[in-house]
Amino acid sequence: MDWLQFFFLHPVSLYQGAAFPFALLFNYLCITESFPTRARYLFLLAGGGVLALAAMGPYALLIFIPALCAVAMISSLSPQEVHGLTFFFQMGWQTLCHLGLHYKEYYLCEPPPVRFYITLSSLMLLTQRVTSLSLDISEGKVEAAWRGTRSRSSLCEHLWDALPYISYLLFFPALLGGSLCSFQRFQACVQRPRSLYPSISFWALTWRGLQILGLECLKVALRRVVSAGAGLDDCQRLECIYIMWSTAGLFKLTYYSHWILDDSLLHAAGFGSEAGQRPGEERYVPDVDIWTLETTHRISLFARQWNRSTAQWLKRLVFQRSRRWPVLQTFAFSAWWHGLHPGQVFGFLCWSVMVKADYLIHTFANGCIRSWPLRLLYRSLTWAHTQIIIAYVMLAVEGRSFSSLCRLCCSYNSIFPVTYCLLLFLLARRKHKCN
């Protein structure tokens, strides 16, 4: 009963599981002939509203208000100015909510309600959809809802025109978790003809359920190992590495199981399947590729594959638009988006330095190491170093507080990121001399 109690009674998992029958019902209704497009939008929107109220209670207003404001700005602003204003409004709103969490945790020293944590997580996902949509409009990929030429349209027509946008921002399969779905893909899936709508693959859902079950069993076993060992305060040398690695493994298993559950909900509703996809339609990007994450010896590849849709969103929103220090700016924005806790700021900035060092180290090694035995040894050592550094970053980010960060930095584990920092300095200096 240990893993059942830990996973299925987790609030987000519980609400995601409760939404599953409605996702299957939506998929079934889309296959029938009597479910028009507007009814599909309304079903997804109503489901999102009910799920938000059930999961967040009164805090659901923190989701509804920015979603309605975003639709109002999208409907009234020109494509040239829509992204800048919606971005600053959405990030400003999210930052205020995170400051409320800081005030509760650090000033009042009170644990915030679980519903507030769920709301903040959903708000971060809403920020992804709002900024993705505003970017699509500013880049001309999506037709703007700007009504400058139709100012005499009735209120009812304005509301029907805004329905796809508000439905996209609040549709229930992605409200509490899941891979970022672009507005183009969302609209294509909702408007897909009955003949092209993918049927429910119970084998695919069963396989995902078995994956979740296996991950939860591993998590139970690993949690017992972690609870039986010493903490970072009492560990010594190699024991610190083992404690850090096992604790980070517990975090990773939790993320993997939740991402697979979120992916299953999107598939059940018909938003995650490639079946029935039209030519030119955007492909679905799942958040997790466990094999790549656990076998890669490149920190930079891990960064691109960890929570893949979010990594692609950050690349588009920040990295590709930055003229100087794009890696640093991307990770700094990620720390802002996550809430600017001390551990998060340190963790993401440390990660950015590790990615930069990773590029230089592997570029240098690829030019020097020729024989396959040395390459095998090099790959093994860099794989171990990558896993340890990722574990270090993960403990910093998940620990969040300044006291947890101090314990981590004062432990024996800090020797590994310091080693990469020294290699970065030496290789950057060598590269500068060669140039």
Swiss-Prot record:
Q: Where in the cell is it found?
A: Endoplasmic reticulum membrane
GO CC, alphabetical: endoplasmic reticulum; endoplasmic reticulum membrane
Q: Which residues lie on this side of the membrane: Lumenal?
A: 1-5, 57-59, 102-120, 228-240, 339-340, 398-407
Q: Which chemical reaction does it catalyze?
A: octanoyl-CoA + L-seryl-[protein] = O-octanoyl-L-seryl-[protein] + CoA; decanoyl-CoA + L-seryl-[protein] = O-decanoyl-L-seryl-[protein] + CoA; L-seryl-[protein] + acetyl-CoA = O-acetyl-L-seryl-[protein] + CoA; L-seryl-[protein] + butanoyl-CoA = O-butanoyl-L-seryl-[protein] + CoA
Q: Name one GO biological process term.
A: lipid modification
Could you tell me the EC number(s) of this protein? 2.3.1.-
Q: How is it modified after translation?
A: Not glycosylated.
Enzyme's top EC category: transferase
| Family stated for the protein in its record | Belongs to the membrane-bound acyltransferase family.
Report the protein name in the record.
Membrane-bound ghrelin O-acyltransferase MBOAT4
Q: Which organism is it from?
A: Rattus norvegicus (Rat)
At the highest ranks, the source species' classification is: Eukaryota, Metazoa, Chordata, Craniata, Vertebrata
